[in-house]
């Protein structure tokens, strides 16, 4: 019987079915996860030490929830691997071709996405890995949160309908994630013990909004 504790241990030791499907590559993916977590902790500690305004319970809460949702996105990347027609992404893309709320969406998936799935798969993986990285580190969160909300909107609409025999999905779970990621963007939660706060304080071009730093400041 699985429990939250046993499932957490299995994930942290790369001993889940999704991890094991990757063979020895799973250890590289696990190392990446630990690297992101170490980076998140480094930015949190640095911000806490350097900026008294960061030392609030609200910032701790925003940091913890942002990192948790980033971990969710990271875990979700695993079933996009290995690339090919045997992974979970291909199955759910097929589902979208028959379950999307609107005909134009169904037709686009059936006639464009599925025939070019081998090209689409890496882009979807990198997009979700980007969301995970941004949220765990608190990096460019206004941009990443907006993109993640729109990405999830596509998922919500894509499997909105349910045909006989289709697996059940709870649509509200996607709605909650849309609003949560959108909230991270609106509140710019990368400024709560994240890389965005560190960049806006320590990188002159970002702090002063000069040159390319102005764009970084806008999306952070």
What annotation goes with each model-predicted range?
Residues 1-100, 107-126, 137-220:
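Extended, low-polarity transmembrane helix blocks
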Residues 127-132:
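Core segments of transmembrane alpha-helices
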């Amino acid at each position: 019987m699985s429990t939250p504790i046993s499932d957490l241990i299995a994930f942290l030791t790369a001993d889940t079915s999704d991890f094991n499907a990757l063979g020895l590559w799973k250890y590289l993916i696990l190392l990446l996860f630990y690297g992101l977590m170490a980076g998140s902790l480094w930015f949190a500690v640095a911000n806490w030490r350097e900026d008294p305004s960061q030392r609030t319970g609200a910032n701790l809460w925003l940091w913890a929830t942002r990192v948790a949702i980033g971990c969710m996105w990271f875990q979700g990347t695993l079933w996009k691997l290995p690339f090919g027609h045997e992974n979970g992404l291909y199955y759910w893309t097929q589902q979208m071709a028959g379950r999307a709320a609107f005909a134009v969406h169904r037709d686009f998936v059936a006639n464009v996405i599925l025939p070019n799935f081998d090209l689409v798969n890496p882009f979807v993986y990198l997009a979700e890995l980007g969301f995970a990285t941004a949220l765990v580190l608190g990096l460019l969160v206004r941009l990443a949160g907006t993109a993640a909300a729109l990405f999830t909107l596509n998922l919500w609409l894509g499997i909105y309908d349910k045909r006989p025999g289709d697996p059940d999905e709870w649509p509200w779970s996607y709605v909650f994630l849309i609003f949560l990621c959108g909230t991270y963007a609106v509140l710019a939660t990368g400024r709560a013990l994240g890389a965005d706060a560190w960049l806006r304080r320590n990188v002159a071009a970002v702090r002063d909004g000069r040159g390319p730093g102005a764009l970084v400041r806008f999306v952070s």
